[in-house]
């Protein structure tokens, strides 16, 4: 009635902009999508199927507006997530050894069951470095804060994260907040890391648990203030932490 044009996107057969394949690589995602009988290949400067699918929504808008497709695809290839939204940062732990690095996924701005599952999938597939730190084995480590506003199902939804295949593939999971305690208790002993009610305590203790070669993902609802944990990890560096999107 209002004359609005509805355009759908996603991976289902009925979507107007249908994502047909996604290849998540170490630092980017390459996807293919079909729209109006044509195919397009595009890249996003971040690993993760969820980023590729969201990118399809942007490309659908560009198509409907009649924008130049080549320019749209080029612009999409330059997009990268910002701080707190999945930014990938390399932390240099020793100024004398360029290999002594720690990789950080800063996803501390928000969290819900779907976005946490997507972030864990990215972490579980991330490459690690071996034989560069004290532990010698590079590890995939998650630091998770409460997912807020889930109502009475909140405790069960937090505990259920332990059963995700991506979670089971991790080496260690540290938890912050009363709701995340349900996940902490559901984890096997080999994966169970630190638990604190507040982010300040985790920020004070976590750096001693990390080592060169590790890949760490920090994610939680904004009110959990996990940006403080991100800052603590960044402060482990020798003054030259590098956002991968900035090169």
Region locations from a protein language model:
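A general beta-strand register signal
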Residues: 32-34
């Amino acid at each position: 009635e209002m004359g609005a044009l509805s355009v759908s996107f996603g991976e289902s057969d009925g979507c107007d902009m249908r994502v047909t394949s996604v290849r998540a690589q170490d630092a980017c995602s390459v996807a293919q999508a079909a729209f109006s009988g044509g195919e397009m290949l595009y890249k996003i400067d971040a690993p993760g199927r969820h980023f590729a699918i969201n990118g399809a929504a942007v490309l659908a808008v560009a198509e409907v507006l009649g924008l130049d497709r080549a320019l749209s695809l080029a612009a999409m290839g330059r997009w990268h997530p910002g701080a707190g939204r999945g930014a990938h940062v390399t932390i240099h732990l020793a100024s004398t050894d360029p290999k002594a690095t720690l990789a950080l996924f800063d996803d501390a701005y928000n969290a819900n069951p779907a976005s946490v599952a997507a972030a864990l999938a990215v972490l579980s597939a991330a490459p690690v470095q071996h034989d560069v730190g004290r532990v010698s084995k590079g590890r995939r480590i998650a630091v998770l804060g409460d997912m807020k506003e889930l109502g009475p199902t909140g405790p069960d939804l937090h505990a259920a994260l332990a059963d995700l295949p991506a979670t089971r593939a991790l080496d260690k999971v540290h938890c912050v907040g009363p709701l995340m305690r349900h996940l902490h208790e559901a984890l096997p002993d080999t994966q169970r890391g630190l638990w604190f009610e507040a982010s300040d305590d985790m920020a004070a203790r976590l750096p001693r648990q990390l080592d060169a070669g590790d890949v760490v993902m920090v994610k939680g609802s904004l009110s959990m203030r996990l940006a403080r944990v991100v800052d603590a990890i960044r402060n482990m560096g020798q003054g030259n932490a590098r956002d991968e999107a900035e090169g």
